[in-house]
Amino acid sequence: MATYIQRVQCISALLSVVLTTLVSCQIPRDRLSNIGVIVDEGKSLKIAGSHESRYIVLSLVPGVDLENGCGTAQVIQYKSLLNRLLIPLRDALDLQEALITVTNDTMTSADVPQSRFFGAVIGTIALGVATSAQITAGIALAEAREAKRDIALIKESMTKTHKSIELLQNAVGEQILALKTLQDFVNDEIKPAISELGCETAALRLGIKLTQHYSELLTAFGSNFGTIGEKSLTLQALSSLYSANITEIMTTIRTGQSNIYDVIYTEQIKGTVIDVDLERYMVTLSVKIPILSEVPGVLIHKASSISYNIDGEEWYVTVPSHILSRASFLGGANIADCVESRLTYICPRDPAQLIPDSQQKCILGDTTRCPVTKVVDNLIPKFAFVNGGVVANCIASTCTCGTGRRPISQDRSKGVVFLTHDNCGLIGVNGIELYANRKGHDATWGVQNLTVGPAIAIRPVDISLNLAAATDFLQDSRAELEKARKILSEVGRWYNSGATLITIIVVMIVVLVVIIVIVIVLYRLRRSMLMSNPAGRISRDTYTLEPKIRHMYTNGGFDAMTEKR
């Protein structure tokens, strides 16, 4: 049976290698490099869909049951240091528990613990609606309450034992790692030293060791003790602090050695303080270790692009920043939520994305389908590192080779130039000097004739020159407009000015006064004439406004006519 299992494992590993090789070979990296597209060898994909939980109970004060009270004063001083560190943390946890409560608690018997978190209802007291941060804190609180009974038993047993590490497992398969610090030092060094050096010397040694331990404690768990949120555990400091092998501590994780390496490398082991006991000076941390699942036959390649030349014109191919290749699928990869280790991308979900058909065929080697755009500025990269060498566009850039700074002349039929330590050594691009890797090999990869697709709009069009011309035109038109305004302001100024209006008003007043004076003079003249010539003495030849018929009646003319009759 064991032989059969080994054969199955070997066949699975062989198939995985074959699939990975086929996937990596379907992207013609040499052909793409000739148009400035650089694609690396790729890394595998692992999905972190779930996690395992651990609880680390830290006993921060050793049990000092020494004779004659040796070391008691040093322990009291050490506890005062711990109080300043732990009291704010304890108060924050109390506030969290006051705001976030778990209802519908499931009763558990004393013998058989039951998992009741998934049946719990997370609610709030002081806040109306639970936010995501509150729910996260509520989950941690619920998990802490689940393990509360087991943690209490651990604390009780740790106060009665001198064992340094106890690994216990509760009923739901979660493990509580109890670390009792300094106990080995007290048992192995302090007690024997009392009989040899005396109480005072032993107490001083204990005080020095406690101070050293406090410093190492802050180094190992400073980020975790500074907040009630989730922080990465410093595993190297944990290993140094407790003189334990991290691999041995994590042997119970249901995962392979490579997964453990990826988890440690990316610092994905998170710890959260869920309990602070100031009576026993114990701190409980909830530790989450992600469970990784590798997706077979999948590689994620990092892609980039530099400018290249065709017939003296500079062009640029746009490609996704990351390419995901699967047996029959080629697309982009959204790694915004992923973390990268040396050999793997660890993602919470499948990062595959669809890309246009033309871009897909371009990545597969059909350069006639590559979407290109003409380079109109200097922001496009001109060189990149490939296989220990440098690929550069030496038509659009100034390239030199060797310590003598020999200029490099690029063939106009070639899009880029490949430079390595063997054919160049010291490489210079636009004044930047680069030393190629001595182990790098010639990366020319057989230069081929280049044909690319038509230029398309794949990014905002650069119209900086047109905008500059339009800006100059606007400035000129503004100057002309100001001149026109000045001319218009001068036209009609004589009647629009305030002095003109005042002059008109004064003239009108003078004319009005003259008219009034003339009327008064005429009136007085007529009056004087009437007073000097009464009505009876007016000459008949004198012209008056009175009708002549009136004189006929008043001067006897009518009586003469009667006598004649």
Swiss-Prot record:
<keyword id="KW-1169">Fusion of virus membrane with host cell membrane</keyword>
<keyword id="KW-0325">Glycoprotein</keyword>
<feature type="site" description="Cleavage; by arginine-specific endoprotease">
    <location>
        <begin position="116"/>
        <end position="117"/>
    </location>
</feature>
<keyword id="KW-1032">Host cell membrane</keyword>
<keyword id="KW-1043">Host membrane</keyword>
<dbReference type="GO" id="GO:0046718">
    <property type="term" value="P:symbiont entry into host cell"/>
</dbReference>
<keyword id="KW-1168">Fusion of virus membrane with host membrane</keyword>
<feature type="disulfide bond">
    <location>
        <begin position="394"/>
        <end position="399"/>
    </location>
</feature>
<keyword id="KW-1160">Virus entry into host cell</keyword>
<dbReference type="GO" id="GO:0055036">
    <property type="term" value="C:virion membrane"/>
</dbReference>
<dbReference type="Pfam" id="PF00523">
    <property type="entry name" value="Fusion_gly"/>
</dbReference>
<keyword id="KW-0261">Viral envelope protein</keyword>
<keyword id="KW-1133">Transmembrane helix</keyword>
<feature type="topological domain" description="Cytoplasmic">
    <location>
        <begin position="522"/>
        <end position="565"/>
    </location>
</feature>
<comment type="similarity">
    <text>Belongs to the paramyxoviruses fusion glycoprotein family.</text>
</comment>
<feature type="signal peptide">
    <location>
        <begin position="1"/>
        <end position="25"/>
    </location>
</feature>
<feature type="region of interest" description="Leucine-zipper">
    <location>
        <begin position="269"/>
        <end position="307"/>
    </location>
</feature>
<feature type="disulfide bond" description="Interchain (between F2 and F1 chains)">
    <location>
        <begin position="70"/>
        <end position="199"/>
    </location>
</feature>
<keyword id="KW-0472">Membrane</keyword>
<feature type="coiled-coil region">
    <location>
        <begin position="142"/>
        <end position="170"/>
    </location>
</feature>
<feature type="glycosylation site" description="N-linked (GlcNAc...) asparagine; by host">
    <location>
        <position position="245"/>
    </location>
</feature>
<keyword id="KW-0732">Signal</keyword>
<dbReference type="GO" id="GO:0019031">
    <property type="term" value="C:viral envelope"/>
</dbReference>
<feature type="region of interest" description="Fusion peptide">
    <location>
        <begin position="117"/>
        <end position="141"/>
    </location>
</feature>
<feature type="transmembrane region" description="Helical">
    <location>
        <begin position="501"/>
        <end position="521"/>
    </location>
</feature>
<comment type="function">
    <text>Class I viral fusion protein. Under the current model, the protein has at least 3 conformational states: pre-fusion native state, pre-hairpin intermediate state, and post-fusion hairpin state. During viral and plasma cell membrane fusion, the heptad repeat (HR) regions assume a trimer-of-hairpins structure, positioning the fusion peptide in close proximity to the C-terminal region of the ectodomain. The formation of this structure appears to drive apposition and subsequent fusion of viral and plasma cell membranes.</text>
</comment>
<dbReference type="InterPro" id="IPR000776">
    <property type="entry name" value="Fusion_F0_Paramyxovir"/>
</dbReference>
<keyword id="KW-0946">Virion</keyword>
<feature type="glycosylation site" description="N-linked (GlcNAc...) asparagine; by host">
    <location>
        <position position="449"/>
    </location>
</feature>
<dbReference type="GO" id="GO:0020002">
    <property type="term" value="C:host cell plasma membrane"/>
</dbReference>
<feature type="glycosylation site" description="N-linked (GlcNAc...) asparagine; by host">
    <location>
        <position position="104"/>
    </location>
</feature>
<dbReference type="GO" id="GO:0016020">
    <property type="term" value="C:membrane"/>
</dbReference>
<feature type="disulfide bond">
    <location>
        <begin position="401"/>
        <end position="424"/>
    </location>
</feature>
<feature type="disulfide bond">
    <location>
        <begin position="338"/>
        <end position="347"/>
    </location>
</feature>
<comment type="subunit">
    <text>Homotrimer of disulfide-linked F1-F2. Interacts with HN and M proteins.</text>
</comment>
<keyword id="KW-0175">Coiled coil</keyword>
<keyword id="KW-0812">Transmembrane</keyword>
<feature type="topological domain" description="Extracellular">
    <location>
        <begin position="26"/>
        <end position="500"/>
    </location>
</feature>
<feature type="coiled-coil region">
    <location>
        <begin position="466"/>
        <end position="491"/>
    </location>
</feature>
<dbReference type="GO" id="GO:0019064">
    <property type="term" value="P:fusion of virus membrane with host plasma membrane"/>
</dbReference>
<keyword id="KW-1015">Disulfide bond</keyword>
<protein>
    <recommendedName>
        <fullName>Fusion glycoprotein F0</fullName>
    </recommendedName>
</protein>
